[in-house]
From Swiss-Prot:
PROSITE patterns: FBPASE. It is found in: Cytoplasm. InterPro entries: FBPase_C_dom (IPR044015), FBPase_class-1 (IPR000146), FBPase_N (IPR033391), FBPtase (IPR028343), Fructose_bisphosphatase_AS (IPR020548), SBPase (IPR023079). Belongs to the FBPase class 1 family. Mg(2+) 1 binds at residues 90, 111, 113. GO terms for cellular component: cytosol. Mg(2+) 2 binds at residues 111, 114, 259. Homotetramer. It catalyses: beta-D-fructose 1,6-bisphosphate + H2O = beta-D-fructose 6-phosphate + phosphate. Its EC number is 3.1.3.11. This is Fructose-1,6-bisphosphatase class 1. Pfam families: FBPase, FBPase_C.
Length: 315
């Protein structure tokens, strides 16, 4: 099991911790650059404009000023990091090429401010990041070399993995990240469920699964924000988040490249599972930036039970 917050013998800063993970210097630098960018994003969240930017993204969604500002912060940090060749953002229409030479470089897919519509009611939001070696972003998430999210809540926490377990860092009063949890692990099953989407639009299989969870006494915990809901399941080590196929949206709502792959990577690294109901999220082949998929993510046994209810829906 992962250690509880404060159980480490001394505070460990993020850069020093990364250097102990036996990863490349370029990857250490990239992760630290993203962590630095998050300090400017949280400042924007706390003090920025809550109005509408007057533009829309690739999906036709109206962009909030905070979305645009957060995207600009992250994109510029990545562009000038010196270790990134391609960038894809949920707020951009196409892949942005920083350099045509991918040697020793990384490609980054990110959602700069997931759940930004929750900021004006003061609920938690977050940044989600997936990192790939080389210049190919349209490959299965299984090939990622790292993933992370930063949660902007009552505390600012950063959760990351480079394939060596899941670690949580928390921003202190000096705006530096210090290690608070090591080797975070999921339990086999749990009693929390976070169901997204309008229930009256659930398919019969998904409705039956929700009733199963209710009958066994699982507690409903859903904030409307993907990052805080996943963080709750991961840090408590129990439960399942689901945003299923809906009758009018067979591919669900969440984006494979920007949201699902990074979270699936982190949950699997913690001993959990993530599926679209038919196959692991990390084994899906992205066909474009705008690809969406249903998701069931959390404890292995809870995810396996969901697939049992969906058996036959994959044909």
């Amino acid at each position: 099991m992962g250690k509880e917050p404060g159980s480490t013998k001394f505070q460990t800063d993020f850069r020093r911790h990364l250097r102990e993970q036996n990863i490349s210097g370029n990857l250490v630098h990239l992760l630290c650059e993203i962590a630095e960018a998050s300090k400017y994003v949280i400042n924007a969240v706390r003090t920025g404009d809550l109005g509408v930017a007057g533009t829309s993204n690739l999906y036709g969604e109206e962009q909030l000023a905070l979305d645009v500002l957060s995207d600009r912060i992250l994109r510029k940090r990545l562009m000038y990091s010196g270790v990134v060749c391609n960038i894809a953002s949920e707020e951009m229409d196409e892949i942005f090429q920083v350099t045509s030479n991918p040697l020793g470089m990384f490609s980054v897919a990110y959602d700069p401010l997931d759940g930004s519509s929750l900021v004006d009611v003061n609920l938690a939001v977050g940044t989600i990041v997936g990192i790939y070696q080389g210049d190919n972003l349209l490959q299965p998430g299984r090939n990622m070399v790292g993933a992370m999210y930063i949660l902007y809540g009552p505390r600012v926490s950063m959760v990351y993995s480079v394939g060596k377990g899941v670690y949580e860092f928390t921003m202190n009063h000096l705006m530096e990240f210090t290690l608070t949890r090591e080797k975070v692990q999921m339990n086999p099953s749990g009693d929390i469920y976070s169901p997204g989407g309008l229930r009256k639009k659930y398919t019969p299989e998904n409705e039956a699964y929700i009733r199963y969870l209710e009958d066994k006494g699982s507690k409903l915990r859903y904030s409307g924000g993907f990052v805080p809901d996943i963080n709750q399941i991961l840090m408590k080590g129990k439960g399942i988040f689901m945003y299923p196929a809906l009758t009018d949206s067979p591919n669900g709502k969440l984006r494979l490249l920007f949201e699902l792959n990074p979270m699936a990577y982190l949950i699997e690294q913690a001993g959990g599972a993530a599926t679209n109901g038919c196959m692991p999220i990390l084994d899906m082949q992205p066909e474009g930036l705008d690809q969406r998929a249903p998701i069931y993510i959390g404890c292995k046994e809870d995810v396996a039970k969901a697939t049992e209810f969906l058996n036959g829906a994959c044909a």
